[in-house]
Swiss-Prot record:
It comes from the Eukaryota. Keywords: Amidation, Amphibian defense peptide, Cleavage on pair of basic residues, Secreted, Signal, Sulfation. Residues 1-26 form the signal peptide. Expressed by the skin glands. Residues 27-170, 184-188 form a propeptide. Pfam families: Gastrin (PF00918). The modification Phenylalanine amide is found at residue 180. This is Preprocaerulein type-1. Belongs to the gastrin/cholecystokinin family. Transmembrane segments: none annotated. GO terms for cellular component: extracellular region.
């Protein structure tokens, strides 16, 4: 799943990365811009699908957790689950930072690159279109980061609130079921 998303991001980054272009390349560049726009939209759709596959809405994740851990004993450690989710979140954030850096680096560096890139161009390449696509990709990466963080459990405050509710008495496992199979303190 993550390999597919990362491959889509890598392909979009490589196809959108401006290279030095020979003169007379503007007509072909317009065609490439259309393809890059299509790839950006495909990437956005792929990230939405990926986030949905990771668990959907927070309420759906909670329902899935209740079903997933309903019959588990103490074989799943709460700290292990939190640690793995934290690791996945950090890995996704690092991958998206690398992708954003490959798209042009810091805003100052992008501005310097834009000045050099468009210094000798005629009016056949619209600078706003190119900057707009870069801005779109930046926003798409930011949205992907938010979607990924939400899919992994929401904000740190939300995860903490969920954990406090889920593990309030310390005697219950992930779903509120007692260790001996009793529910809500009732005997079988």
């Amino acid at each position: 799943m993550f390999k597919g998303i990362l491959l889509c991001v890598l392909f979009a980054v490589l196809s959108a990365n401006p290279l030095s272009q020979p003169e007379g390349f503007a007509d072909e560049e317009r065609d490439v811009r259309g393809l890059a726009s299509f790839l950006g939209k495909a990437l956005k759709a792929g990230l939405k699908i990926g986030a949905h596959l990771l668990g959907g809405a927070p309420q759906q994740r909670e329902a899935n957790d209740e079903r997933r851990f309903a019959d588990d004993d103490d074989d799943v450690n709460e700290r292990d689950v939190r640690g793995f989710a934290s690791f996945l979140g950090k890995a996704l954030k690092a991958a998206l930072k690398i992708g954003a850096n490959m798209l042009g680096g810091t805003p100052q560096q992008r501005e310097a690159n834009d000045e050099r890139r468009f210094a000798d161009d005629e009016d056949d390449v619209n600078e706003r279109d190119v900057r707009g696509f870069g801005s779109f990709l930046g926003k798409a990466l930011k949205a992907a980061l938010k979607i990924g963080a939400n899919a992994l459990g929401g904000s740190p405050q939300q995860r903490e609130a969920n954990d406090e509710r889920r593990f309030a008495d310390g005697q219950q496992d992930y779903t509120g079921w007692m260790d001996f199979g009793r529910r809500n303190g009732e005997d079988d």
